[in-house]
């Protein structure tokens, strides 16, 4: 915005150059300094506010919350205290988070097995929780999801060479974490049903 001054009514002292606004990096550095300077209850309350705002957006793992609070300048001790308190209140539960996250990834993207395990470990979840959540996925449900994904992919393929189709379907299912025996079974059934349709 341009500011116009009347030279007859405005003195030079009144005309100051506009202060430069801080860049996002400068604002973040200033915020980290302020948060690091906080102590005791003030630090706990400010860190808790950060965690609650994060939880307002979506459920988070304890690791994600701790990373967010420490990246904002709070000590890891303060972050752990806040997480402990939120866990006591039932607002943070890694097992419930892992179940919901895995269910969402499985239903929306069809991920399972090693691909889902990798996604869960990125969230900072323990190997025990990951193993428990992965064991809860039903084999029949996994097979039907793999079948649906492969069927959808097969419709989009324009090639007619069976080996190319087999390779592309197998690699797509393997990237999503399906076991080789599931991939082979699904692909064989799809190719067999396609052969029957052509007769």
Model feature map: region roles:
Residues 1-199:
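An alpha-helical, amphipathic repeat domain used for nucleic-acid recognition
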